[in-house]
Amino acid sequence: MADFNEYKGVWVFCEQRQGALMSTDFELVSEARKLADELGCEVTGLLLGDNVEGIAKELGGYGADKVMVCDSPLLKDYTTDAYAKVVCDMVNEYKPEVLLIGATNIGRDLGPRCAARLHTGLTADATHLDIDTAKYVEFLKESSTIDLSKQKFDYEDRNLKMTRPAFGGHLMATIICPRFRPQMSTVRPGVMKKAPFDQAKADACQIVKPAFSLTADDIKTEVLSVEK
């Protein structure tokens, strides 16, 4: 089992397409900011692509303290091989406690592959996230028919509580990952509220360009064209 004391921070994989950030990025960074404030840690965006440093600071306006920019022509278009390698290498190097990924077509491909390589769990298509157990209990009061008076809750629990619909939406399941790190979830687009953009925070956002290893030999697929 990993030493949990080594894992700090809430990370968001920030998806870009043709050099433009996705609205899901801003939703997830905004939600990550809330979680990080409860954990007392930083929010870090992880941005992969080719010549994408110029769009990174916008993520700071929604709550990112820093953005790790991995720039390479080999990352211009999404390929599972390249992106999974770089994301996992960054996670193994910097050890975030939480990693959020948008449940887009790309995120649904990338998330499970990274979780398998990192030997951790993944909650798919989450629609609600909590750290604070008291807030989670309030969420249950508002959204479920459970008799909470008969339930026992550990109010000292600081695991990420990831809630997602199951059985066609007839059941809401809350999942935790208490034994492995990072705690990973893909998050359904459009369900998290985007914070108002703050230009001062965007200006203050730190841009980091970490060293990483990626060669053409790491990539088994070739992108012939991208159709919109």
Where are these regions (language model features)?
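N-terminal glycine-rich FAD/FM-binding segment characteristic of electron-transfer flavoproteins
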Residues: M1-K228
